[in-house]
Structure formats: structure tokens, C-alpha cells
Amino acid sequence: MSILARPAAPSPRPNALANWLLLVAVLVFAIVVVGGITRLTESGLSITEWKPVRGIVPPLNQAEWLAEFENYKRIPQYAAFNLHMTLEGFKAIYFWEYMHRLLARGIGAVLAGVMIVAWWKRAIPAGYGWRMIGIFALGGLQGAIGWWMVYSGLSVRTEVSHIRLATHLIAALLIFSALVWTVLDLRRLARDPDARPARPTALAIAAVLILAVQIMLGAFVAGLRAGYAFATWPKMGDEWFPAGGWNVAQGLANLHENPIVVQFVHRWWAWAAAIAALAVARAARKRGAVGPVHAVATLIVVQIALGIATLLTGVDIAVAVAHQAVAVLLLAALLWAGHGLDKPKVS
């Protein structure tokens, strides 16, 4: 039979499909990391147009670079902060935004390719086709959210909306989570052809939501530059909460608009996220899991240390990027631990 021939009957290959989707998940992890670098280097507004196809090709000569630079000069961010910027400086920030968009296109192409080949080879197990279509649709929506975020910084603001930034990050992690959970389901199916997809327990759902809130708060911290408000730990300056830090006029909007309050909540909500993740790890251990338990525990320690280091270094870019990267790895470990909670306990 030709390698291009379509099988006459379904030929599910859950392990092979899991490997390919794991690759896509790794690419999503990479784009989240690059997105963090893009934000921290103030590169996100360097490309002021949305060209899904033509935008694949970067400027190739001096005239094209100058045209792109002129586009950037028209937005408020340039006038407010970058009047001194040279063309070489512009190329540096353009690089990260371009790589971020190129990775996004690459992820879409790889996922589409995997879906098409798996469909043609009839290798998608029953019940997984619509799930993969849903993940691909989320990817398309994420592209629109990305442009919606960038657009917020092109006319009046000198930076993107931190609310839209958080939406963009959470959408990326929703895609990442769907991929990781699907990979785990497919691995289970490969071990046992009669296995059903795992059902997330209330504990696992609660822990993931608590961690998602903490990651969202981290996006608020980045978007509001709240990490620069206080570079001390555990106190904020000389106080646990600075006098006058809560703006009475803002009311509950302090929780997402006030840099001091956002940093404070992000500091202490971290402990709720850690406790919830450890509760899942403990439950997983009772069901015989070892790898995910160690992964969750180790990553919690590393993540807390990186969070403190991010503050104490005055938001050093390398440390802050590592902090964001480990947040995604912790989410993956939490999903791994939570995936097996529908199994009976080991006596």
C-alpha cells in the first residue's frame, strides 16, 4: 500500500498522535516564553499592522525597514518613550514581535498538518476528532485576541491594555492545557484500548482555576509594571501593605487597576496556588503517582524562589522570563497530577 493511500478502515494511533500533539504543546510553551520576552522588552507594538499571510516575510531591505519604522513612529509609544530610538534599536524590538507572530503561524500550520494527516490516515481515535477541531478553533481565536490586544496600544495608550494582555495569556494557556490533557488521554488509550478519557475531579478543577488566577495576576503585574512598585520581600518597603496603597475612589477596581494592590495580591495568592497544587499532588500520590507529585512539589519551590528573585532584582528580564516559563511548567505538572485523580486510591 502506498504511504499516501487512505486506509479502508479506521486505524487509530493514539500514541503517535499524542507525540505530535505534545510537540504542539511544546511550541505553545515556547510562544508563551517569547511572548514574555516581547512584553518585558517593550517590543509588542513594533509591528503596527495585522497581515496574517504577507506578514510572514519581514522587511528585506533598507527601504522596507524604514517604512516599518515610520509606521511605528506614528503610535503614541514612540512619541512618549522612544524619540531617541535608532533604526537598529527598532530592529531589536521588531525581532521579538516578529518571532512571536512567526511562532503563532508555525503552531497553526503544524496543528493543521497533524489534523489533516491523522484524518486522512484515519488515525484519530473515536471521540477525539471534534476535540482537535476545538483546539484548532481556539488557536484561530487566539490570533484574533492577539491583534485585539496590540490594537489597544496603537491610538491612545502607550502600551497594550493589561486586561487584554491577561486575556491573551490565559487563552494561550487554555490551548496549552487542552493539548496536555489530550496527550494524557491518548497515552492512557494507548496503554488500554478500552480506556475512557479522564474526568477532571472537583479538586483538580479548583486547583487549576486557582493557579490560573495567579497567572492572570502575573499578567496584570506585567501589564501595569507593578513589579517595579516595590523591590522588597516579604514586606512592601517597610510595611506588609503600604499606607495609602488602597485607592478608596477606585473601589474593587483596585484589584486589577492599582499596581500596588495587584502586586500585593499576586504575592499572597501565590500561597493559595501552592497549597491547592500540593493538595492535588497529595491526592495523586494516594493513587500511586510518583513523577507528577515530584514535578509539582519541585516546581512550586522553584517558582516561589523565582517570584521573589524577580522582585529583588528589580524585574531582571531573564529572571522574569524564567518565572513565566516555570508557571507554564507548573500548570503542566498540575494537569499531569490531576489527570489520574479519577482512578481509585492505592491501598
From Swiss-Prot:
<comment type="subunit">
    <text>Interacts with CtaB.</text>
</comment>
<keyword id="KW-0408">Iron</keyword>
<comment type="pathway">
    <text>Porphyrin-containing compound metabolism; heme A biosynthesis; heme A from heme O: step 1/1.</text>
</comment>
<keyword id="KW-0350">Heme biosynthesis</keyword>
<feature type="transmembrane region" description="Helical">
    <location>
        <begin position="132"/>
        <end position="152"/>
    </location>
</feature>
<feature type="binding site" description="axial binding residue">
    <location>
        <position position="266"/>
    </location>
    <ligand>
        <name>heme</name>
    </ligand>
</feature>
<dbReference type="InterPro" id="IPR023754">
    <property type="entry name" value="HemeA_Synthase_type2"/>
</dbReference>
<feature type="transmembrane region" description="Helical">
    <location>
        <begin position="317"/>
        <end position="337"/>
    </location>
</feature>
<keyword id="KW-1133">Transmembrane helix</keyword>
<dbReference type="GO" id="GO:0005886">
    <property type="term" value="C:plasma membrane"/>
</dbReference>
<feature type="transmembrane region" description="Helical">
    <location>
        <begin position="202"/>
        <end position="222"/>
    </location>
</feature>
<feature type="transmembrane region" description="Helical">
    <location>
        <begin position="106"/>
        <end position="126"/>
    </location>
</feature>
<dbReference type="GO" id="GO:0016653">
    <property type="term" value="F:oxidoreductase activity, acting on NAD(P)H, heme protein as acceptor"/>
</dbReference>
<dbReference type="GO" id="GO:0006784">
    <property type="term" value="P:heme A biosynthetic process"/>
</dbReference>
<keyword id="KW-0472">Membrane</keyword>
<dbReference type="Pfam" id="PF02628">
    <property type="entry name" value="COX15-CtaA"/>
</dbReference>
<dbReference type="InterPro" id="IPR003780">
    <property type="entry name" value="COX15/CtaA_fam"/>
</dbReference>
<feature type="transmembrane region" description="Helical">
    <location>
        <begin position="260"/>
        <end position="280"/>
    </location>
</feature>
<protein>
    <recommendedName>
        <fullName>Heme A synthase</fullName>
        <ecNumber>1.17.99.9</ecNumber>
    </recommendedName>
</protein>
<feature type="binding site" description="axial binding residue">
    <location>
        <position position="323"/>
    </location>
    <ligand>
        <name>heme</name>
    </ligand>
</feature>
<dbReference type="GO" id="GO:0046872">
    <property type="term" value="F:metal ion binding"/>
</dbReference>
<feature type="transmembrane region" description="Helical">
    <location>
        <begin position="165"/>
        <end position="185"/>
    </location>
</feature>
<keyword id="KW-1003">Cell membrane</keyword>
<comment type="similarity">
    <text>Belongs to the COX15/CtaA family. Type 2 subfamily.</text>
</comment>
<feature type="transmembrane region" description="Helical">
    <location>
        <begin position="295"/>
        <end position="315"/>
    </location>
</feature>
<keyword id="KW-0812">Transmembrane</keyword>
<keyword id="KW-0560">Oxidoreductase</keyword>
<feature type="transmembrane region" description="Helical">
    <location>
        <begin position="17"/>
        <end position="37"/>
    </location>
</feature>
<comment type="function">
    <text>Catalyzes the conversion of heme O to heme A by two successive hydroxylations of the methyl group at C8. The first hydroxylation forms heme I, the second hydroxylation results in an unstable dihydroxymethyl group, which spontaneously dehydrates, resulting in the formyl group of heme A.</text>
</comment>
<keyword id="KW-0479">Metal-binding</keyword>
